[in-house]
Amino acid sequence: MADILSQSETLASQDLSGDFKKPALPVSPAARSKAPASSSSNPEEVQKEGPTALQDSNSGEPDIPPPQPDCGDFRSLQEEQSRPPTAVSSPGGPARAPPYQEPPWGGPATAPYSLETLKGGTILGTRSLKGTSYCLFGRLSGCDVCLEHPSVSRYHAVLQHRASGPDGECDSNGPGFYLYDLGSTHGTFLNKTRIPPRTYCRVHVGHVVRFGGSTRLFILQGPEEDREAESELTVTQLKELRKQQQILLEKKMLGEDSDEEEEMDTSERKINAGSQDDEMGCTWGMGEDAVEDDAEENPIVLEFQQEREAFYIKDPKKALQGFFDREGEELEYEFDEQGHSTWLCRVRLPVDDSTGKQLVAEAIHSGKKKEAMIQCSLEACRILDTLGLLRQEAVSRKRKAKNWEDEDFYDSDDDTFLDRTGLIEKKRLNRMKKAGKIDEKPETFESLVAKLNDAERELSEISERLKASSQVLSESPSQDSLDAFMSEMKSGSTLDGVSRKKLHLRTFELRKEQQRLKGLIKIVKPAEIPELKKTETQTTGAENKAKKLTLPLFGAMKGGSKFKLKTGTVGKLPPKRPELPPTLMRMKDEPEVEEEEEEEEEEEKEKEEHEKKKLEDGSLSRPQPEIEPEAAVQEMRPPTDLTHFKETQTHENMSQLSEEEQNKDYQDCSKTTSLCAGPSASKNEYEKSRGELKKKKTPGPGKLPPTLSSKYPEDDPDYCVWVPPEGQSGDGRTHLNDKYGY
C-alpha cells in the first residue's frame, strides 16, 4: 500500500508540472504509426477516455474489451499497448488526445487493402491501408482522413484492423477491418445503416461507409477472400430467420428456456433419427402410419404453392370480392382514423379459427383511404391463401345464400332503433336493388320537377312544425304545467329533443337533395323556344286568304292560262318577260348595270304586289257573273294570233335597231305590244301596266336581260337559267383547250 501511495504522489506531481509544459506538436500519421509510446501521457487519463469494447450479439462482432489497467503496475500497461494515443493540438487550447485506445487484438494489415473515395459517381482518390493498424476519421487536421463537412465530428470514427493470431489462427471473429463509431453526433453509416456507437462492426470488401451528412462514400477494396458471401435465402426467409433469432434471444433473456427443455428436445430428436434409420427399408412409397398432409385435401394449394401471391397481388380487392361472393357474404370495410392521414382498415372474414373466433384482417396505412383498403384486402387474401380457402372451387365451399326477402332485407345484427346515421336503411336499399325489388327508372325532366316539388313541400311542412313547436315552447302557459303538458301531448304540437334533432337532420338532407335536383334540372331542361308573334303582314295575308276562299275559282279573268298555278287553280302570277333576239345577247357587260338591274327588280316586285292588291280589291267590289266551265277554259286559253303577232313584231323591230337607238325602239316595241289588246278589259289593263314597267326597265347597251329555258316553268320568277359567256358552251371548255390541245 505504501508503494501505491508513493506512486500516486509522484504521478500527481508530474501532472502539476505537466500543466506548464509546452504542448506537443501534431505528428503525421506515418510517423505516429512508427513512433514508440510516449511516456509523458498519463495512463490513467487515457484509460478514462478510452471506451470499452461492446459486443453485439446479433452482428457477430468481437467480444474483447480493452485491457483494464492494473493499479499495481502502470509500466506493464504501457508495454502492452501497441498503439497509444498521440496528442493532437487544437487551435484554441492545449493538446487533446483522440478518445480511442487500440485493442490488443489489433495489428497492421498485411493484405493489400485500400479505401476508395467516391463522390458524385466519380472516384476522387484511393488510400492504401496496407501496413496500417487503424485509420482515424474526423474533422481535425490531425486525423488520418480529414473531412470538412460540418456534420462530421472532430474525432468521428475509426476503421480498426484485426490481425490473426501468432500461429496464423484467430478467434471466432475472423481477421479484417472493423468500424468503430466514437460517439459522433450525426452517426456513422455502414451500407446505409447507422451503426450503434462504440461498437465494432465488421466491414467486408465492397462495403460502403459514410460519415454524418457527408456525401463522400468510402468503399473498402481488398482480396476476394474477405468479400461477404451471398446468402441463398430470400429476403422474406432472412426476415423470418431474424424474427426467430430475436424470439430465442428474448426467451434466453427472460429465462423461459431452461436447459432441461433443450436436453429433452435434443434427446427426442436423436431417438427419432435413430428409429428412422433402424426401420429404414423398402416401403414401396408408403410409410407405416403415415400422417396425411392437410394440403392433400386441396390440390390447388399444392399447384400454386410456389406462386401464391401471383393469384391476387395485382388486384386483391377483386380476389377478395370473389371469395365473399362464393361464400354468399357481403364484403364490408371498417375504417378507423388513427392520426393525421393514417387509417386502420379492418375486414371480418367469414372463417373461424381453431378457437371458434372469427378471423379479422387489419392493415394500418399512412396515406389515402383507398390505399389502406387495398393493403387490408391484400392481408385478407394472404390469410385466406394460407388457410387454403382463397382458390378453392366455388362448388366445394359455397354456402347457401341468405334469403334476405324473408327478413325484409335486414341483417340479423341490424338495429334501426340504435342507428342514428341511416346506414342500415342504405344497406337495405342496396340489397333490395341487387335483388331486383326496386326498379331504377331513368330520370326525366318531369320526374325531377316532381321530386323537387315534393322535397320543397316536405321542407315547408317541417319548417312549419319546427316553428309551431318553438312558439309553443316560448309561450308561458297560463294553466297548470301538468295539464298543459297533457294537452300538448294529445295535440302533438310539441316535439321532444330527439324528434327535433331528427327534423333538423331531415331538413339538412332535403336542402342537399333540393340543390342536387336543381342542378340536374338545369342540365336536362329542354331548350326554350320563343313564342311566335303575328306580324301585320301575316294578319293581312290571313284576311286576304279568308276573302279569297269566298270567291269562285274560275272565270275571274280571260286569258287565265298564263296565270295558272301548278296545282291547277286559277290565280295571278308575275308577268312573263318577252323573248329577246340573240343580237342583244352578244352585247358587252358593264359592272354598273348589274347593280341597277337588282334595284329595278326590287322596284318591279313592289309594284307587282301593289297591282295585285288593286286587282283583288276591284274583283271584290264588282260581282262577277257565273261562267260555265267550258267557256272558262276557252277564255283561259291565250289567243294564238295575239302571241304570233307579238313574236313577229318584236323580231322585225329588233332587227332594225342600231346600238344608238336601242332604248327608243324598245319603248316603241312595248307600245305596239300594249296596243294589241285582247277582248277583255282586264287584259288591256294588265298590258298597259306591263308596258309602263318595261319603259322604266329598258336595258342599256351592255345589259343582258336574263332568258328562261323551256325546261323550267316560264311563268315562275323563282327559276332562272345561267347563260354561258361568249365563245363557251358551258361544259368548261374554252378556246384555249382547242388552241393547246388539252
UniProtKB/Swiss-Prot annotation:
Biased composition (Acidic residues): 256-265, 591-606
Start-end of Pro residues biased regions: 96-106
Stretches with biased composition (Basic and acidic residues): 72-82, 607-619, 732-742
Tissue and organ distribution: Ubiquitously expressed.
Skewed-composition ranges (Polar residues): 1-16
Residue numbers spanned by region Disordered: 1-112, 254-282, 565-742
A Pfam family: dsrm
GO cellular component: cytoplasm; intracellular membrane-bounded organelle; nucleoplasm; plasma membrane
Record InterPro entries: Cell_Proc_Reg/RNA_Proc (IPR050923), dsRBD_dom (IPR014720), FHA_dom (IPR000253), SMAD_FHA_dom_sf (IPR008984)
Subcellular compartments: Nucleus; Cytoplasm
Residue numbers of Phosphoserine PTMs: S28, S90, S258, S412, S476, S655, S658
Domain FHA: 135-195
GO molecular function, one term: mRNA binding
PANTHER family named in the record: NUCLEAR INHIBITOR OF PROTEIN PHOSPHATASE-1 (PTHR23308)
Note: Isoform 2 is a prediction based on conservation with orthologs.
Designated name of the protein: Kanadaptin
